[in-house]
């Protein structure tokens, strides 16, 4: 359930990106929305996984650490390669946090 998933975030439990997306899909209706993450601009329909996770995290008042945990192995990839250039939305969020996130529209609506 949504509450069970939220309780796991930030624990020592390793989250899977796919599980995060599945919980979002089960509990929210998604509408593609453009969003800004630090100096990265994402068009509506672009980087939908990041869009869904950031919107989900905002709706559920997750902090930066909890939000990053929702990215699962992709966040772990970034931690393993601090000088890398992949996963730009994760890397930007690590630098700017919630102050860098801005949506142009509503991406998720609770069912």
Question: What role is predicted for each listed range?
Answer:
Residues 1-7, 107-110:
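Long, charge-rich, low-complexity intrinsically disordered regions
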Residues 6-14, 42-43:
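Short, surface-exposed loop/turn motifs that are enriched in glycine and acidic residues
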Residues 10-32, 105:
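Short, charge-rich, low-complexity alpha-helical interaction segments
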Residues 23, 27, 70-74, 93-96:
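Short acidic/histidine-centered micro-motifs embedded in hydrophobic/aromatic stretches
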Residues 35-39, 107-109:
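Short coil/turn segments at secondary-structure boundaries
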Residues 38-88:
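Amphipathic protein-protein interaction modules
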Residues 85-111:
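Long, compositionally biased
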């Amino acid at each position: 359930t949504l509450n069970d998933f939220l309780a796991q975030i930030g624990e020592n439990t390793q989250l899977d990106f796919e599980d995060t997306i599945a919980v979002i899909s089960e509990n929210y209706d998604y509408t593609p929305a453009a969003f800004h993450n630090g100096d990265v601009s994402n068009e509506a329909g672009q980087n939908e996984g990041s869009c869904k996770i950031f919107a989900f995290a905002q709706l559920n008042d997750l902090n930066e650490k909890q939000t990053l945990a929702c990215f699962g192995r992709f966040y772990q990839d970034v931690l393993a390669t601090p000088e890398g250039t992949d996963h730009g939305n994760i890397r930007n969020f690590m630098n700017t946090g919630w102050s860098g996130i801005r949506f142009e529209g509503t991406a998720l609506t609770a069912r």
